[in-house]
Structures are given as C-alpha cells and as structure tokens.
Amino acid sequence: MTLIKSISGIRGTIGGRAGDTLNPLDIVKFTSAYATFIRRSNQSKSNTIVVGRDARISGEMVKNVVCGTLMGMGYDVLNIGLATTPTTELAVQMSQAAGGIIITASHNPRHWNALKLLNHKGEFLTKDNGNEVLAIADKEDFEFADVDHVGKYKEESFNQRHIDSVLALKLVDTEAIRKAHFKVAVDVINSVGGIILPELLDALGVEYTFLNGEANGDFAHNPEPLEKNLSGIMAEIRKGGYDLGIVVDPDVDRLAFICEDGKMFGEEYTLVSIADYVLSNTPGNTVSNLSSTRALLDVTTKHGGVYTAAAVGEVNVTTKMKEANAIIGGEGNGGVIYPESHYGRDALVGIALFLSSLAQKKCKVSELRATFPEYFIAKNRIDLTPSTDVDAILEKVKEQYGKEPDVQVTDIDGVKLDFPDKWVHLRKSNTEPIIRVYSEASTMEEADALGKKLMQVVYDMQ
C-alpha cells in the first residue's frame, strides 16, 4: 500500500491504514491544507474552488470527501463532475475561481487515485507553493468554518465550453477537417475521454469507432498510452478503413496517435508533429523537458525559433515556456501545451491541431511521420541501496564529462549529457533508491548502448 506526497499533490492506493494509503483521513488532511494555503496566499478574491474527476472507481468517494472538506473549510464548491484534467484547468480560469482540485491518478492503475492541486490560474502549484501545502498538512495547521460560514455546493459541466474554446483557436481548421471526412478509432481507456471526445469529434465532422468507451473506471488494459498496452486498437486499425488511431490516458492530458497501417506514430512525435504545424503558421520558440526527443529542437530550428529544455514536470515546463515566450511546448510522453488555449497539457487541443495539420497536408499519417527526423529513446534504470548518495554520484558524472569538449552538460534536473548526435539523461527518483537513465540516438541499439555505458560508469563509481 502506498501514499506519495509531492509538490503537485498526493497520490496513493485506495484502502489500508491512515498515513499509509490514500484514504478519507488523509484526503481530509491534504484538502484542508490546500484550502488553508489558498486562503493565506490571497491570490484571488473568489471563494470558490473547482473540483473535477476522472472515471476511476474510487472517484465518487474521493470527490465526496474533498467537496465536504472544502465546504467545511468555508469554500464554495463548483463540482464539474466527470471531467478531463484540461477541462478542470479551464474551468478554474473561466469561473475565475480561487483554485481547483483534480481527482485523478493519470495513467496509474485502477486501484490508485490522487489529488492534483491548481492555483487561481488553473495551473499546477509551483514547487514553493506545493511545499507550503505539505508543511501545513504536516502541522495540521488549519481551522474549519463555523456554522454560518460553511461553503455552498454547485454542480455545472464545462465540457461544451472546453470544446468551444478548442474550436475557436485560430489554427484549428474545422472546415478542412470536415472536408477531409476522417474516420478514426479511439481508445479512451474507460474514462472521461469517452464522454467529451465524441462531442469534439462530432463538432469536427469526424467519423469514429470507440474502444473501451464506457466511462466506468474499470480499465480494460494498462492505462498508460504506450505501444505495449495498445494491441487492441492497433489490431482494429489494421482491419482497414481508418485514417488514424487516437489514444488518451484516463484524464486526457496525454495523447498518442497510430498510423493508418496500425503502427505507432510514436508518443514522442505527438508534440513534434503538432509543433511543426504551429511553427509553420506562427514562428516562435518551443520548450520540452530534458527527457524528450531532440526532434523538437530540429523542427524548431528549421522554422527559425529557439528551443529551450526544462526540468521534468509540467509546472517546470510551463514556467520555462513563459520565460522563453514559447508558443508551444510540452513533454515527450504525449503532453501538448499550447498557451493560446491555456498553460496545461490538453489532448483535445492536440487532437484538433493534429487533424488540422493532416487535413491541410492531405497526406497519410505514416507519410507525415516520415517527414520528421528519426530518433529512438531507450529507458533503463540503476537500482541502488537506500544508503547510496545519489547526488554525489551524479556530481561525479557531471565532473567527468564536463571535461570533454564535445559534450554539453545540463544539471537543472539530474545530469544530461548532450553529444553531437545523441544524448543521455540521468535522473534520481524522488520515491525510490534508483537512477532513471534515458538515452536517445538515431538507432535503438545505439541509444541502448549509450544508456548501458553510463550505467556502467555509475556502477564503477560506487
């Protein structure tokens, strides 16, 4: 049983003892701490907090505890019901609320759930803000409202407003999409994508077949949108008659595509392809995290923009995007952030922009994929003992490779070594005694060999 506390919220498995899992007592504690932080931060005059959730089986229970606690803290609750993460983020903006809580464990298995915390802009809390919430929770330093100041409760859907905001984006070419008469297969893994994506696709004139479309939270397969989990939709597309496949995770902030031949487009290339379309229409800068493909750098340079890398984590990417004045950014796991809409990963925005690009180019998805540089990312891990000084090891790696003239060393998040034609990124886990090793090259064999080489370097340093 697990309970993990981080700056972005808390996540854990359902059931078990208080303090060890995500259970009602801990939900009350962290919700109260968040409400206390919002009150003290005084960033908004609003007394309303938005609550949205994915379709997980435990979601109704968690939602009831969260909403009751917020009301007990004196906040009015705007419950938007079964909603995607980006819908909840936009609802905070549109309602000018004081903040928001998203109840979702994203791509984690069905027995997990989590509270993700938003500020008054509908964006994830900064590291300092997140640490403040954790400190308040540790001290249990909160005060509940008296009977005359208990919060009110309201339910309202924001799905249509989210869809309308996507359709209103200048680069979403609804006319071209409708004329293309696309037929798609969509895997929404038994969650909220099954509620909102049919409405979006109907508005775009796209014919569709849904797999795992019932939003019951009983995930038909591992919910992370990786090739190893997507045999069902890949087989469906291979039957023929489809222009592409669309895959989202349970809270619809990650997006993957499948080519018309049933092969993966590549989750790293979701952002790359959409950025290429955006940059071709509105030149500018881009940002992705350090573990994302170099293809975004190539595409950005092609269009005359500047690429900047950020530390892993959505809040780090959005912060860097604002600093760099980036017009698009995100993460290589299929997370697309388009500030013209909002500063959050949004699969609805990604779908609409991708279909616009495809409709205008009048090509097959596999042909579009072939226009981008070919890179492969290998993922490995180094298991360490709990007593290992991981920071000291990473510092040694930095010192060793910092002396080499053809290696660019970046240390804002672990250590990343950029070689002329490949890179490797070493990050320590915040929850386990391990170092994650990501490496990229022009072939998978070369990428894996580079990762294994750095793993041996680390082993030799112990």
Where in the sequence are the language-model features?
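An N-terminal, well-structured beta->alpha segment
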Residues: 1-68, 72-73, 152-184
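Gly/Ser/Thr-enriched, mixed-charge loops and adjacent short helices
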Residues: 13, 113-238
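Short glycine-centered, acidic/aromatic-flanked micro-motifs in structured strand/loop junctions
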Residues: 52-53, 186-188, 259, 340, ...
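Proline/glycine-rich low-complexity loops and linkers
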Residues: 71, 131-164, 259-332, 337
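Short beta-strand-to-turn element immediately C-terminal to the catalytic PLP-Schiff-base lysine
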Residues: 117-120, 256-260, 337-339
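Phosphate-binding and adjacent anionic-ligand microenvironments
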Residues: 244, 282-462
